[in-house]
A protein has these predicted regions:
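Glycine-rich phosphate-binding segment of PLP-dependent enzymes
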Residues: 65-81, 104-112, 138-139
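Rossmann-like NAD(P) dinucleotide-binding subdomain of oxidoreductase/dehydrogenase enzymes
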Residues: 143-238
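Residue-level signal for inorganic ion chemistry
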Residues: 51, 87, 109, 132, ...
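Long amphipathic alpha-helix in the N-terminal Rossmann-like dinucleotide-binding domain
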Residues: 70, 92-103, 115-141
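Terminal low-complexity tails and localization/encapsulation signals of metabolic enzymes
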Residues: 2-56, 89, 93, 143-164
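Short linear capping/connector segments at secondary-structure termini
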Residues: 108-116, 145-150
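Short, well-ordered beta-strand elements within core beta-sheets of diverse protein domains
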Residues: 54-60, 75-81, 128, 163
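Generic non-transmembrane alpha-helical segments
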Residues: 93-97, 101-104, 202, 206-212
């Protein structure tokens, strides 16, 4: 986490709505820090069980995606040549943080997409954790280079990955994409569903605590026709 930022700053505060606290998660995670959006614009996140807004997020723009994509491209130059041992160390720290905050992640998914807490814990959060555990297991013995006949097959990281994930398995779909990307030396720009973005933002805190180099993982919230389209079209995203 860069100097001058804190988890409280990153996650905003809380406001009162109908006698209930509304979480404010108004920052994006870009280049290793929680940052303000280029242009202020907010969206209420609805708890489907109560049909009430329980959180506010910022909606990003093309400018936010551009900032994240350029950060990811800069980071790719060095992250793509890190050793397997280095990447395993970061993955293990993410796994440890994931395990420690599993109840928080499950609770957040219950709030944002309505899964009962047992299902959110056993089938949502735990399965998401499995993707990171499996990525680390495979990476430990994966042959990135091997001889085939008279030639050598070398597997290299593809570049900057633009990831757009849905609401119904919000953390599982994030993990199933982010884990192999980080394991293989790719960098990431993630847009979680604006309908259920809070578990992904909590996951970003775990990534931050793991100490990944700035720009390796970036998160920008927003709608499909704006942030999603910008990710799909950005020249720095492979």
């Amino acid at each position: 986490m860069k100097a001058g930022t804190s988890r409280n700053t990153a996650n905003g505060g809380a406001t009162q709505r109908r006698g209930r606290e509304t979480m404010e998660k108004l920052n994006f995670y870009i280049d290793g820090a929680w940052v303000d959006p280029a242009t202020p614009s907010t969206l209420g996140v609805v708890n489907p069980a109560t049909e009430e807004i329980f959180a506010q997020i910022s909606l990003g723009s093309k400018a936010d995606v551009d900032r994240a994509a350029k950060a990811a491209r800069r980071a790719f130059a060095t992250y793509s040549v890190t050793s397997v041992e280095q990447r395993l160390s970061w993955l293990q720290k993410i796994i440890e943080g994931f395990r420690a905050r599993l109840p928080d992640l499950a609770r957040m998914m219950t709030l944002e997409m309505g899964a009962p807490i047992t299902f959110a814990t056993e089938r949502q959060a735990t399965v998401a954790l499995f993707h990171f555990e499996e990525a680390a297991r495979v990476l430990a013995n994966y042959k990135f280079e091997e001889r085939m006949g008279n030639g050598i097959v070398r597997r290299e990281p593809i570049g900057v990955c633009g990831l757009i994930t849905p609401w119904n398995w919000p953390l599982n779909q994030v993990a199933s994409k982010v884990a192999p990307a980080l394991a293989t030396g790719c960098t990431v720009v993630l847009k979680p569903s604006e309908i259920a973005p809070l578990s992904a933002m909590l996951f970003a805190e775990i990534v931050d605590d793991a100490g990944l180099p700035p720009g390796v993982f970036n998160l920008v919230n927003g709608a499909g026709p704006t942030v999603g389209e910008a990710i799909a079209a950005h020249p720095e995203i492979d």
